[in-house]
């Protein structure tokens, strides 16, 4: 059994690394951008997270007379959890609160993207324990968009 687990890990590790090579993990959504952000926002609030901002990039572009495919950014977090991390690693404040970007690509597909916890761990020199809560955003998105 341990050999099977090792084989499984060795096979899938490169796939996980490739998915977040640039630090961004993208999850496909079957909903449009507004519905996706609504669902993610509701799931975040249900988990007790604070919504700091919801930025409609495409809406603001339209106000400026520019065209942009639907794109929204949700800024969310938990000050009780994030503040101690930023106290320990002040550079982490550039990436906190957490951000979820939801956009429609050129083919009409909608994606929800976030910074990979492993990327943030490397970027800021976090311990496994410090990085662990940052990885929960993926599960939040997947649960919201199922």
Predicted regions and their residues:
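Compact, glycine-rich, soluble single-domain proteins
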Residues: 33, 41, 45, 49-98, ...
